[in-house]
A protein has these predicted regions:
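Residue-level signal for the nucleotide or nucleotide-sugar donor/cofactor binding architecture
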Residues: 90, 102-105, 178
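Cytosolic-biased juxtamembrane loops and peripheral soluble domains of multi-pass membrane proteins
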Residues: 8, 76-94, 98, 124-131
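Hydrophobic structural segments characteristic of membrane proteins
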Residues: 49, 111-213
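A hydrophobic, helix-centered structural microdomain
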Residues: 2-75, 112, 179, 184-213
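Short, glycine-rich, amphipathic interfacial segments at transmembrane boundaries or analogous
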Residues: 52-91, 149-169
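Short, conserved beta-strand/loop elements in beta-sheet-dominated catalytic cores
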Residues: 97-119
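Short, well-ordered beta-strand elements within core beta-sheets of diverse protein domains
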Residues: 95-102, 171-175
């Protein structure tokens, strides 16, 4: 086995998980004051649960309940992608809009990285009933990778991507996992968050639609 391939295999099997544990544990401690501030803001605007749990697809198409800061009203229809709601903005709270735009609603997933259900970098976990995305990911082996807080498809377009493109990017990641690739995605994520790149409430596939026009 060439040194490069051997190194990637070792990273994928051992080092990646070790880094997930170290970084998520540190993040939990450092970000705990921010967690409390966000929790208070959610409670003040729309009394109800601070966290939102939803059934998602994990590695090898197992399921788990992803955890986020609640960004939508308590009476929002469950298990429905935002882009399928007739009027997404109607359901999103004011603090929720800010959390979603800055991706701060995803922070509780640090705890799920620590527990091993997720990784820092990997394909974003699909809803259990996003059958089209799950089927497309099967073509590229992307369902056999631990889902991530951020991923290659996220930084390459996020909500702007159509299902086929999103699955293809997830497949590219699954076939090329390495320390260098993860670092690249991590820093690209920071840039995307600061620019609010790819966030389209109620939309999907906008990038391809623009190209066709």
């Amino acid at each position: 086995m060439p040194i490069g391939r051997k190194g990637r295999a070792l990273y994928r099997r051992y080092v990646k998980r070790l880094l997930d544990i170290i970084l998520s544990a540190a993040g939990t401690v450092v970000l705990s004051p921010l967690f409390l501030i966000i929790a208070a803001a959610i409670k003040i605007e729309d009394p109800g649960p601070v966290f939102f749990r939803q059934k998602r697809i994990g590695i090898h198409k197992t399921t788990f309940n992803i955890m986020k800061f609640r960004s939508m009203r308590v009476d929002t229809p469950r298990d429905m992608p935002t882009h399928l709601l007739s009027d997404p903005q109607r359901w999103i709270t004011k603090i929720g809009g800010f959390l979603r735009k800055t991706s701060l609603d995803e922070l509780p997933q640090i705890l799920q990285i620590l527990s091993g259900k997720m990784s820092i970098v990997g394909p974003r976990p699909a809803l259990w009933n996003q059958y089209d995305l799950i089927a497309e990911r099967d073509k590229y082996g992307a369902n056999d990778v631990t889902p991530g807080l951020t991923g290659w498809a996220q930084v390459m377009g996020r909500d702007e991507l159509e299902i086929e493109d999103k699955a293809r990017y997830d497949g590219e990641y699954a076939q090329n996992i390495s320390f260098a690739f993860d670092v690249k995605i991590f820093f690209m994520t920071i840039g995307s968050v600061l620019r609010h790149k790819g966030v389209i409430e109620g939309g999907t596939g906008e990038m391809k639609k623009e190209k066709k026009q």
